[in-house]
């Protein structure tokens, strides 16, 4: 899938933006706080029906405005044009349309325009709680497996209902708990199996990217832990019910799964330097791209936001070689350091566009300015 053109009104600090893109490489150059990340976030919104940074849609409306609109004009691999529209008014439900037809369920859109974003916020994958790492798995698998996304939605709905019962001060019949526990178990087993299969296939791809960027200086790994492994999830939930009632929420289940991120045999959270952590995250996301490209029917979009920060020169050079190659389809990349972008452009050749970003205004640079 190629994003040919985007139109943005009142999204974050972007008042009015109309841009045509290169099918290969699009570079956005400017100081921090000017709107580079917001442009990438608008592209992200068109794939995931939400912002990467702020899930509260109304807070993404530009200050003192009543609405935002994002429109993307795409071209599929077979040349078919696709138009995606998102509009949001304050105190109103957002509208999401494909070719002018509104979606009845936003989840039906997930995976239609596969996308991978590498950004400074990825540091939470290492530094944050287990929910960040589960979300990573969810974002990848949901883009190519509708059964997974449906099971995850069913599980979370049942989890909310079970937690409501656990908080109740009134006596609750066991049969009522069983209704939601059986739904959690059924959906949770699907989620567990698919997460396990994904991680098993994903690990060697991830390790290959890390080895290339680090030039084999360190070994990395991933391990997946779940209460659903080696036990019936329904029995796990039933056995945990008494303790869960005391706490007022569900202590066990696939919503507590963990993806351990390792440098050597130890958690990278504890052992990794800033450069190693950044290398780990970049390799993780490039492996995500590669995995989605292998499993899907279309090449994902790749968004790279300030990707070179905290990396030494040799690792920057390895990433430049990767990004400038032919494996990554359409790329959108931001940086405050023009030199980084120029090195990529030198390797890519002629198929690129450079944009200058200043105070929410984004303008394509003329050839003589580049």
From Swiss-Prot:
Residues at which ATP binds: 30-37
Superkingdom of source: Bacteria
GO biological process, one term: DNA replication
Keyword presence, rRNA processing: no
Subcellular location(s) per record: Cytoplasm
Database matches in InterPro entries: DNA-binding_RecF, DNA-binding_RecF_CS, P-loop_NTPase, RecF/RecN/SMC_N, RecF_2
Alphabetical UniProt keywords: ATP-binding, Cytoplasm, DNA damage, DNA repair, DNA replication, DNA-binding, Nucleotide-binding, SOS response
Chief location bin: cytoplasm
Pfam families (UniProt xref): SMC_N (PF02463)
Molecular function in Gene Ontology: ATP binding; single-stranded DNA binding
Entry GO terms, CC: cytoplasm
Listed Gene3D superfamilies: P-loop containing nucleotide triphosphate hydrolases, RecF/RecN/SMC, N-terminal domain
Function: The RecF protein is involved in DNA metabolism; it is required for DNA replication and normal SOS inducibility. RecF binds preferentially to single-stranded, linear DNA. It also seems to bind ATP.
HAMAP family per the UniProt record, alphabetical: RecF
Family per record: Belongs to the RecF family.
Protein name: DNA replication and repair protein RecF
Organism the protein comes from: Bacteroides fragilis (strain YCH46)
Gene transcribed to yield this protein: recF
């Amino acid at each position: 899938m190629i994003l040919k053109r985007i139109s943005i009104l009142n999204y974050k600090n972007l008042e009015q933006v109309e841009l045509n893109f290169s099918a290969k490489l699009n570079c956005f150059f400017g100081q921090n706080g000017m709107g580079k990340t917001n442009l990438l976030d608008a592209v992200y919104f068109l794939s995931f029906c939400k912002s990467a940074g702020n899930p509260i849609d109304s807070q993404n409306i530009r200050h003192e405005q009543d609405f935002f609109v994002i429109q993307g004009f795409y071209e599929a691999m077979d040349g078919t044009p696709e138009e995606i529209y998102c509009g949001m008014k304050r105190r109103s439900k957002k509208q999401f349309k494909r070719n002018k037809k509104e979606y009845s369920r936003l989840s039906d859109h997930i995976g239609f325009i596969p996308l991978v974003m590498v950004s400074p916020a990825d540091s939470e994958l290492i530094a944050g709680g287990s929910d960040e790492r589960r979300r990573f798995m969810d974002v990848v698998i949901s883009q190519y497996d509708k059964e997974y996304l449906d099971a995850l939605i069913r599980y979370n709905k049942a989890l909310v209902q079970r937690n409501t019962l656990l908080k109740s001060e009134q006596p609750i019949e066991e049969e009522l708990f069983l209704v939601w526990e059986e739904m959690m178990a059924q959906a949770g087993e699907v989620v567990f199996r698919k997460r396990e299969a994904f991680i098993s296939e994903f690990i060697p791809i991830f390790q290959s990217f890390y080895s290339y960027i680090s030039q084999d200086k360190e070994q990395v790994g991933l391990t997946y832990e779940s209460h659903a492994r080696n036990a019936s999830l329904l029995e796990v939930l039933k056995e945990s019910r008494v303790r869960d009632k005391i706490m007022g929420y569900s202590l066990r289940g696939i919503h507590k799964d963990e993806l351990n991120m390792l440098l050597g045999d130890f958690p990278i959270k504890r052992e990794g330097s800033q450069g190693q952590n950044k290398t780990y995250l970049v390799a993780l996301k490039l492996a995500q791209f590669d995995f989605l490209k292998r499993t899907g029917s279309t090449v994902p979009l790749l968004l790279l936001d300030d990707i070179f920060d905290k990396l030494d020169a040799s690792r920057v050079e390895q990433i430049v070689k990767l990004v400038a190659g032919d494996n990554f389809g359409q790329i959108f990349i931001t940086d405050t350091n023009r030199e980084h972008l120029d090195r990529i452009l030198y390797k890519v050749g002629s198929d690129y566009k450079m944009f200058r970003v200043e105070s929410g205004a984004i303008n394509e640079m003329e050839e003589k300015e580049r």
